[in-house]
Each structure stands twice: as structure tokens, then as C-alpha cells.
Amino acid sequence: MRKGLPLLLTLLMTSTAPGLRAESFGHADVDGLTRTVSEIRGQLRDPASRKDDVRALLSGRLAEVRQDGAETPLALDRLATAGKLHTVPIDFMLAQLRLQTARHFNVEIEKALANRAAPALFIRGGSMTLDQLLAEAANSHPGALEQKGEKVVSHWPIVIWSDSALVIAPGQSLELSTEDGAFILNSGLLTVDGGELSASDGTNPGLNAFRPFVATAMTGAVQARRAHFKSLGFGGSGATSGLSVLGAALFPSKIASYLTDSSFENMSGISLENTHRVVVSDNHFSGGTGPAIALKGVTGAQIRDNVITGTTEAQAIDVQNTSSSIDVTGNILIGNRGSGIFVANDARDIAITDNLLSGNGRGGVSVVRSACVTITDNIVLSNSQVGIKLRASHALTLSRNDLVANAGAGVSIVDQDENARVVVDGNVFTGNKSGIHGGAASEVALTANDFSGQSPILLDGEFAPYVPHLLRAAAGSNADSRALTIHANTSSADPVDCKTGS
């Protein structure tokens, strides 16, 4: 039975139970969807493109991806007072970086500083625009900044103190010198409103791997809209990742960080850690090592309507380390080296909804050692490895997803605890290596799934003996008889309660 199914039995796998998507996939449908996704990918090659540029192609099976999320907060916070420019010794700057980023501090950063005798620029007492910063630096600190065409190049590190702000306005461009080891430490407010923030070309002689970065820490916040970030960051996630927001329990930021309608080109990535109320929406991430967006210990973030393509080393979206109440909605994640979305290490209350995940190197979605994750209304198409992989996780619901032509199983469920439970409801399986793979799994409840396009292997691994049960359930006369529970829990332990958090 595992090797193949007669056509009649396969047709039995089309369920008409409520909640199922209205139409099954045929070969022509798969070919059409594949062509459309290829066209979407082609139109998104320009880093300046956005999801809106392909909205006309998001129809039919892709209509759920088309939907807009909640309104983006567009109001930028402003400081009423004018800031002043000072300098601080570089050792103070490094001590602050070490203090404010704690374990995220990279001790090798000191090697990147071309002139250890030079101080760092220090903004405090209010707000400064980039033009004001350039003018004051030219008067009192020659050589710290210079105008090169339309760009302002910083050769010194810049500190934005907790009572201050730096504003990069529309049409303005700040370039941090790679050769000089420049970077920004922000514990105040960094605003990039229609401007550009980038790293210069070249190699740092003291630390070849170094690329300039922006670290926002403790009470700091960063707000960007219609901005362009380019070539920032090195060393994966953390303070040097490119653009980071690193919160602290004793020093919570009173201003929310958000990044919207912006381009991130060849960035190592965005790293959000131990912070809350963050919105990352309507952006385009192209190239870079990845993760494009990494969350660790984050509460209450919205990651929505972003385009992420071509990460070279890691996943597109990475949610880890007790992150909770995270909404990942309406994103287009295509051609990334790792998984499209990776959730791990005690993440909880994660909603993954209305996303398009295609051509990703380590599968569409992976959930590892996490709980209370819902994966709903996603298109998971032609990914290497598995469409959706669940490992050692609790209280998971997969509903109304299209799992199509993935190199591995449409869904893989492995290494579950004895009291874990997975609900697989109303999904469509088409042309995957197998429908659902099981290994050391606990309870899996199957209802109203469509396997009519999934052949020859419906259930794989330790689930293979359940194929006859699945066929009988599919032929049932009512919704209750069409349900199938594999490995029903017999443990006396209470299941995870997603409402109470226990």
C-alpha cells in the first residue's frame, strides 16, 4: 500500500468536509501555480520592489497571500529639543557597547578601529538631523565626517545617547566607513525617513570580516519608513548583524521600533532581541547571509507583508528563544538558503498565516521545541526537503495549507513527547514526495484533508500502516467518521494549555 494506490482509492481521498479548500489541485493547476510564482520571483528581483508590485498576480490559490495585514503605524516619534554634538573616548564607546549589548558584544570589534586615538561622535540632549551633524562635525571635529557627492561618510563611530535622536531625512544618505571601522550605537532614537544608511565598499585592514552595523540597545528605538539599508552587518544575528534592536528588562524602551516600506539589500540581517511591540512590515530583503529577520526573546511582534529572497546562509525568518505572541502574516519568502520560517527553542503563541513559501533550501516551515503554533492558509510550494516540519513541539495546528510539490514530505512530524498533540485539518497535499511522514510521533488528528493529488505515497514512515484507516475515513458518510487520529494519547499528563500558558 505504501508504494502505490489504485486511482479509485486515490479519488476517495478527496474529502468534502467543511473547511476544506474548494478546489483540489490537478497537474495543470500545479504547473500554473509554479509559473505564477516564477513570475512573482522575476518581478521581485529589483530590491526596490514591494509586495504591492506583484499584487495583481496574487489571485486564485494565492489570494490569501494578497490580503493586507493591519494598518502600519506611520507616525514617527520626534524629540522637541535640539541636540548637541560632543565626543567621547573610543574606550568609553566600546565599554558602552559592551555594557548595552551584554553577551552580544564582539570583542574583535576593537581590531576594526583604524584610529584608536580618535574619539566617537556623541549626540545628546535632543534631536539632530544628518545635515546638522555634518555641519557641527565640520566645525569642531574635522575628518570625522565628510561630504562625498550626495553621501555623508562617517569615519568615526557615532553614539546616539538615551536623551537624543538622529534623523536621516528624505534624500539624505549616511555611509559608514568600512575601512575605518565606523558603526552606530543607539540608545536613543534613530529615524530613517526616506533616507539611506549603508556601509562603504572596501575591506577593513584590522578585521577582514568587519562590516559597519547599527546596534540599538537598552532604551533605544529605531523607526524607518521608505528607507534604504545596504551592506550592513557581519557575524550572523546579534549586535553586529546589520540592524539590531537589543532590549533589556531593566531599561525598556518607551518608544516602539518599527521598520516599514523599506529596502534591505545585501544585509547580514535584522536582529530583534528581548524587546517588544516591534513591527516589520512591507519591506523587501534581498541577498545577505540571513536570517533576514531574527527574533530572540521578543514579545508582541508583527512580521507581515515582507518580501524576502536569496539569503545565502540561513533562513528568511527566524523566531527563537522564548519569543511569544508573534504574528507572521502575508510574507513572500522565495529562494532562501535555509527554511522560509524557522521557529525553535521555547517559542510560543506563534501565528503563521497567509504566507507564500517557495524554493527555500531547507523547507517551508520548521517548528522545533516550541508550543502553541498555528500554521494556516499558507502556500508551501516546491521547497527542498519538507514542506512543514514539526519536531518535539506541542499544541500545533495546521489548517487550510496548500502543500505542493515539495522535495520531501508535505508534513513531517517527528520526535514528539508522549502528551503532544498535532491537528492537521483541511489541508491540500499535492505531488510531494509523501503526504505526511511520521517518526516517534505522538497524537496526530487528521480531518478533512485532501490527498487526491498526492501519490503514490500518502502516509510515510511509522504512519504508513495507517493508510487503510485513512482510506476508510475518507469514504465515511459524515464528518465524525472522516476524522482519523493516529497514536491517540494515553498519557495522564495534561496537554499544553495555550490559553493559560501552562
Annotate each language-model stretch with its function:
Residues 324-435:
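Eukaryotic tandem repeat interaction scaffolds
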Residues 8-15:
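Bacterial N-terminal signal peptides
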Residues 429-498:
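Leucine-rich solenoid repeat scaffolds
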Residues 2-8:
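Sec-dependent signal peptide recognition
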